Every structure is written in structure tokens, then in C-alpha cells.
Amino acid sequence: MDSQLKKKTTFKRLLGYIKPYKAAFIAAILCMIGYSAIDTLFLSQIETLIDDGLTEQDSNILLYGALFVPFIFILRGSLNVASSYFLHWVGFKVVTKMRQQLFDHMMKLPVGFHDQHSTGDLISKITYDTQQVAEASSRAVLVLVKEGAFVAGLLGLMFYQSWQLSLVFLVIGPLVAKVVGVVSRRFRKVSSRIQTAMGNVTTTAEQMINGHKVVIMHQGQKGESTRFSEINNITRNQNMKLVNTRAISTSVIQFIASLSLSMVLVIASFPEMLGELSAGAFTTLLTAMIMLLRPLKQLTNVNSDFQRGIAAATSVFAILDEPIEVDKGSRVVDRAAGDIVFDDVTFSYQKDDEPALEHINFKVDQGKTVALVGRSGSGKSTISNLLTRFYDVEQGSILLDGHNINDYKLKCLRRQFALVSQHVTLFNDTIANNIAYGASKDVSRENIIKAAEQAYVTEFTDSMPKGLDTMVGENGVMLSGGQRQRIAIARALLQDAPILILDEATSALDTESERHIQDALGTLRKNRTAIVIAHRLSTIENADEILVMDNGEIIERGTHQQLLDQEGAYFQLHNLQFSGSA
């Protein structure tokens, strides 16, 4: 019952997408009904042609028929074109709207959602699932209305000719309904598996493409091929189950219909029935019954399209029903001063996980620089995730200029931070547009060039034919790691936010580039609050305070010299790095 209720809810919700285009949708339905009515009208004239035209040898009937046929087929063809156009126009409008809605909603979902779902699966929702909704639903409506109207017309014609024989034929109704009910459940289950399988195909392909260099360097081609083959075969198997179910159900329904047709022929052979039916009437009745098998087959098959569309829509709506980021804040400031306080902050990524941060307390005064150091997994990057509210704290509070960061509107809060991560994201656009990406106001070419010069981007773009107008390729594939990172730093320079978060910002730079960038960052940090997450201790020696982290806790704090004098964890890290580089 829950499954049926969910299906009805999904169907009603899907109809809501059609509502804005109901005029075109109604026009499509009327054209389809008209198409089926013409087919029924054409069949109804068989009796006249046989009884009056041939049996009575009335040549006028045959001549009128010769004029009637071309006209009726021109009208029939016009209605077919119109119905197909209007229906697919509505279908593409629906999928465009749904795809845009899904894309926009995914951007509003919290970072935690994206961390728990594979990129390939989410891409498959936007590309494959939405397309399935449009294609399957359009085909389902086309067949359902057109063939349904044709079935209604044929049944009316059959009852007009002989209601007794028509009743015998209708015995198949309950049996067909039973078969369709069983098949519907099967279609829905298999279609849902196909959505999941296609998501896995996309994910596996995406991982191989993104990690192509790693795959070939570690001779992982065979393993990746085997993994993809297994997933690909699962998709094939599920599709074959769908095809087999459709073929078997069609054959069963047609067999049931053939038994009913046999009964009609037996009853029609009785003397009293032979006396009632003319040759034309019986031919019309028999033709209508035979013609009824085709739309019955189509209507059985349309169930698979309908169930596939419902399964895809359910998958899409599941994402659309995911709650977006909580933004209850109302405080808006043009530019924050930059005072930051972590007050007894504890946080876990998952409820049952060990805390990523535990009882964290520290303060960063306006214009000061605090560095976070420690081994991987100690909680350094988690602090930047909490500051920008990619995640919300479970215990304690984070203050910005004396106000809880939850009190700020999200857009306003994130506008106060310029984040440069070790994982640089570039878009398939020009270098200049990547630097200017997300700028809160229109920026001049001069400002872009200035930021590029400060981040030493022009050092490599000056040798390029198109300079800053050079396309970077997908995620900056045409550039080196150091070049990508310099573009990200130029983006932060242009953003001119009061607070900087540098998460291993110089990790991909060579020694010469790092020296240039350190000079640029030194200029950038003036009169700005900066939180620097660093692995290379040489980059944070001048920080106002250094926090040493381990297992989500701050175990040491002080200036570079103070921490060296303590001869604790920082002292050991320092010796390890500099003895290794000596």
C-alpha cells in the first residue's frame, strides 16, 4: 500500500510539471483522440463497402470510397504530426525545467550531502534520470491516449455490430488486468535497479577518466576494465529482465485474447447468429477484434514505459526533497572586521564517528595571522569547513566580530572569506574569467591584470599567445599544478575579503614560485585576518600564533620561536622537515 501511495504521489507531482503547458498537452490529447476516431471511422465503413458496394454491386459506393480514403489519410497524418509535436514539446519543456530545478537544488544542498554521494551518481540524475522521465512519460501518454481511444472506438464498433459476441470477447478483461498488475510491480522494481546501475556506470567511468594518469601509472587498466565490465553487465542484465518481462506479458495477453477470439468464432457459427449478421457486419466485427490485439499489446508495453518514468521521477524527486542548507541568519554586514573566536567547539562528521574536533578554543584578532599545523587528519581543514559553515558545529560556538556565525546570512558570511585550498577548482574558461569567478561586483580588466601580477600568474601567461584569455581546459588540465594554484590565489586577491583561509595554498608550487607567492601573500595579509593551514613549516614562521593539532585537539600553541623553545610536538615536526631537507 505504501508503494502504491508513493507511486500515486509521484504521478500527481509529475502532473504538476505539466500544468503550465496544459494547453499544448490538451491539444496533443485531442489530436490523438481524433487520430484514433478516424481509424475507427475507417473500419466502420467496411460493412458498407462489402454489403452495399460489393454484394449489392453499387459502384457509387466504391467511387465515393476512392475519394474518401486519400482525404481521410491526409487528415489522419496531420493529426499524428500535431499530436507528436505538442506532446514532445511538453515533454522537453518538463525535462528542461526538471533538469534546471535539479541542478539549482544540488547547488543549494549542504557539503555533507555531496560528501556522501558519488559525483557520477548525481550527474546521472541530471542527465539520464530526467531524460527517462521525459522519454518514458511522453511515450506512455502517446500510447495510452492514442491506443486507449482506439480500443474504446473498436469496442463501441464491436458492440454496435453484435453486443452478444462482444461480451464474449470482453471476458479477457479481468485476466488482462491481473497480468498487467503483476507486470507493473516487476517493471517498477527492475526500472529502479536500472536507475541505480546507470548511476554506478557513470561513477565508475568518471573515476577512471579523472584518475587516468594514476590508472596507467599503476597498471590498473585491467582492474578498472573488470570493474566496469561487472557494472556494465549488471545494467545489461537489468535491461534484459525488462525486455523479457515485456515480451512474456505481451505474449500471454495476446494468447488470452486469441482464446477469446476462438470462442467468438465458435459462437458465431451457431445458426441463430449466422442469421443475424451480414457478411459486412461479421467482417467488420472480426476485423475490429483482430485490430484490438495490436493496441492491447501496445497498452501492455506502455506499462513498462510508465513504470520506468515513475521510477526515474521518484529518483529525481528524492534529491529535490533533500533539505537545503539551513540559513536562518539575518545579520548582514558589508565588510567584517575579522575578529574570530572558537569557543569550546566540538564536531563530528557523522553521528557515530569519533569527533574530528574536540573542545577547540582559540582567538584570532583582526589583522592577525594564525597558523594550524599537524599531521594529516588532525582536524586542520575541519576548522576552515566550520568557519565557512560548510558544516555546523555540534557543541560550542564560533564568533565573528562578537556574533555567532549562525546569525549571519550564509551569503554574507561566505563573502567575508577568501579560500585558497590545495585542491584548486578551475572552470573550462579563460584564465581571466577564472580569476574573476564569483566576483561580487563587475571587475575591470585592470583589476584582473593587477591580481594576476600580484599572484605571478602573468609570469607564465605572458609567454602564451592569448595571455590571460587562454582557455584552461576542464579543471585547468592545460596548466601545471603550480599554475593552477597561482590562479586560485589571484582569485582570492581579487575577491578582497577581510579574512583569508589558506589551506596548503603553496603546496603545489616550486621553490621559485613559492618565494613569489609568499611575497604576494605577505602583501595580501596586511590588515587582514588570516588562517593558514600548512604542512611546510617554513611558510608559517612569521605567523602571530601557531596552533599545533593532533587527533582533533590543540596540543600546543605559541609563536614559532616559543614552540621551538618548548621542544614539544612542533619542535619534532620542525626537526623532521628540516633534517629531511638538509
Swiss-Prot record:
Membrane-spanning segments: 23-43, 61-81, 140-160, 163-183, 247-267, 273-293
Pfam families listed in its UniProt record: ABC_membrane, ABC_tran
Keyword annotations: ATP-binding, Cell inner membrane, Cell membrane, Lipid transport, Membrane, Nucleotide-binding, Translocase, Transmembrane, Transmembrane helix, Transport
Keyword DNA damage: no
SUPFAM superfamilies associated with the record: ABC transporter transmembrane region (SSF90123), P-loop containing nucleoside triphosphate hydrolases (SSF52540)
InterPro entries named among the record's database cross-references: AAA+_ATPase, ABC1_TM_dom, ABC1_TM_sf, ABC_transporter-like_ATP-bd, ABC_transporter-like_CS, ABC_transpr_lipidA, P-loop_NTPase, Type_1_exporter
Membrane topology recorded in Swiss-Prot or TrEMBL: Multi-pass membrane protein
UniProt cross-references to CDD domains, sorted A to Z: ABC_6TM_MsbA_like, ABCC_MsbA
PROSITE patterns, A to Z: ABC_TM1F, ABC_TRANSPORTER_1, ABC_TRANSPORTER_2, MSBA
EC number per UniProt: 7.5.2.6
GO MF term set: ABC-type oligopeptide transporter activity; ATP binding; ATP hydrolysis activity; ATPase-coupled lipid transmembrane transporter activity
Residues in the signal sequence: none
Entry's localization field: Cell inner membrane
Description of how the protein assembles with itself and partners: Homodimer.
Family the UniProt entry places it in: Belongs to the ABC transporter superfamily. Lipid exporter (TC 3.A.1.106) family.
NCBIfam families: MsbA_lipidA
Function: Involved in lipopolysaccharide (LPS) biosynthesis. Translocates lipid A-core from the inner to the outer leaflet of the inner membrane. Transmembrane domains (TMD) form a pore in the inner membrane and the ATP-binding domain (NBD) is responsible for energy generation.
Domain comment, as recorded: In MsbA the ATP-binding domain (NBD) and the transmembrane domain (TMD) are fused.
The protein's name in its UniProt record: ATP-dependent lipid A-core flippase
